[in-house]
UniProtKB/Swiss-Prot annotation:
Cell compartments where the protein resides: Golgi apparatus membrane
Gene name of the record: tvp38
Described purpose of this protein according to its UniProt entry: Golgi membrane protein involved in vesicular trafficking and spindle migration.
Region (Disordered), start-end ranges: 1-25, 362-408
Amino acid composition bias (Acidic residues), ranges on this chain: 391-403
Domain comment as written in the entry: The VTT domain was previously called the SNARE-assoc domain. As there is no evidence that this domain associates with SNARE proteins, it was renamed as VMP1, TMEM41, and TVP38 (VTT) domain.
Protein name: Golgi apparatus membrane protein tvp38
Membrane topology: Multi-pass membrane protein
Region annotation (VTT domain) ranges: 149-258
Side Cytoplasmic, residues: 103-119, 181-234, 295-418
GO CC list: Golgi membrane
Residues spanning the membrane: 82-102, 120-140, 158-180, 235-255, 274-294
């Protein structure tokens, strides 16, 4: 009994931090459950730790999103909440209707697909459909690509789909940029994340644009969103869209397989049906995996470029402040300079000093008489570093006596880069 009591007391008195290692004598006196717990912690597999870390990240992201949603919901008025609920219900109904329509459209096209395959009018009408769904917030781009493969086959359908996509996305980009020009300017001046993403497209813009186009993002919404970045030019965006057109073979191929299954269902053997169905599933799986992988790589590349841009701006800020002269422009391109200036303000806040010496303030302290004509607060430009010695233009504070009734004290703090 005394031995058990002593070992239990020692175990309870041990510190919670596992940083310090115990001697063999102390380990022998520890109770059995402490050895079991420590062995379980030490034998945890790396895969278990990775799964725990991934699960924690998912939980944290979900928690942040829930908090943000609740915060936004509290700010809404009564009628805004009614409108939000109505919009959500409408979106759900439209999504269900679109899924039902997509499933039925191939049954409707089955009897006329062979006749429309040789019709240039049908080709042109479907081309216009793909072209116009490039404008936000229209949907149906992937469905029209599958229909193109269903009616015209994989290669002819791909040509229709690719040409309409390239021209439609470029025109949508230009129109969206024209309409959203005020929004773009406001975002560039206020949102540091938007400015950082705009600057990342300055380095390998074409490569990053191709990666964005390969991501599984809503097509028309992506056209409008990318148009808000002033560092992206319409021709570059059109070229990036043209370079990823081999991706468009996926929906065209799926459409052609669906037509074969619908027309020759009774004639095909079970093995042929299985091959066609497996090819469709495999193609969809490859598309999903590729999109997910490129999406992760795109985010990683964007973060890398943002960190590089911030490091360059930080070095420029520190060099200018060490030399005591204001910052010049970051780029000859006005759009790039605007984005860099927005990012520079954020970096100045992180470093601890401002670009224009906002702390250089002349403070006037009036006497107790309180003259109405005496100013209370003025600002002056910084004229030079602090110095102890006097010049001919400087007055001796001890020789001036008490001075006038209103005295001016200059408050100036300047943070030097370490």
């Amino acid at each position: 009994m005394p031995a058990d009591y002593t070992s239990t007391a020692r175990a309870l008195s041990l510190p919670m931090s596992p940083a310090e290692s115990l001697s063999p004598a102390e380990e022998d006196t520890q109770p059995l459950w402490s050895h079991l717990a420590s062995s379980r912690r030490n034998t945890a597999s790396p895969s278990a730790r990775e799964s725990t870390g991934l699960r924690d990240q998912v939980v944290n992201q979900a928690t942040k999103m829930l908090r943000r949603t609740k915060k936004t919901w509290r700010r809404l008025t009564f009628w805004q909440r009614i409108g939000a609920i109505g919009a959500a219900l409408l979106a759900i109904l439209l999504g269900l209707a679109f899924m039902i329509f997509t499933g039925q459209v191939f049954f409707w096209l089955g009897p006329v697909a062979e006749k429309w395959e040789q019709s240039w009018l049908a080709f042109f009408v479907l081309w216009l459909c793909v072209f116009f769904v490039s404008f936000p917030p229209l949907v149906g781009w992937s469905t029209f690509g599958t229909i193109a493969g269903f009616i015209f086959g994989i290669w002819k359908g791909w040509i229709l789909y690719a040409t309409a996509t390239v021209l439609g996305s470029t025109c949508s980009f230009i129109v969206s940029r024209t309409i959203l020009s005020k929004f773009v300017n406001r975002m560039m001046e206020r949102d540091k994340r938007f400015a950082a993403l705009a600057l990342t497209l300055k380095y390998d813009g074409l490569k990053l644009l191709c990666m964005i186009r390969l991501c599984p993002l809503p097509y028309s919404v992506c056209n409008g969103a990318v148009s808000t970045f002033p560092t992206v030019h319409p021709l570059m965006y059109g070229l990036a869209t043209a370079l990823i057109t081999p991706k468009l073979l996926v929906p065209a191929f799926i459409g052609s397989r669906i037509r074969i299954l619908s027309e020759k269902n009774e004639e095909m053997s079970a093995g042929s049906k299985a091959v066609n169905i497996c090819s469709i599933i495999l193609t969809i799986g490859i598309g999903i995996f590729t999109g997910w992988y490129i999406y992760r790589r795109t985010l990683a590349r964007a973060k890398e470029l943002e960190a590089k841009e911030r490091a360059d701006i930080r070095r420029s800020l520190q060099a200018d402040h060490a030399a005591h002269h204001p910052h010049g422009s970051f780029s000859e391109d006005p759009d790039v300079n605007t984005a860099a200036t927005t990012l520079a303000r954020d970096e100045e806040e992180r470093i601890g000093f401002n670009d224009f010496d906002d702390d250089n303030v002349d403070l006037v302290i009036d006497d107790e008489s309180g003259s109405e004509n005496s100013p209370n607060l003025t600002k002056k430009q910084f004229q030079g570093p602090y110095r102890d010695e006097f010049t001919d233009n400087d007055s001796d504070v001890f020789g001036d006596g008490d001075g006038p009734d209103s005295q001016m004290f200059r408050l100036h703090t300047h943070v030097r880069s370490g």
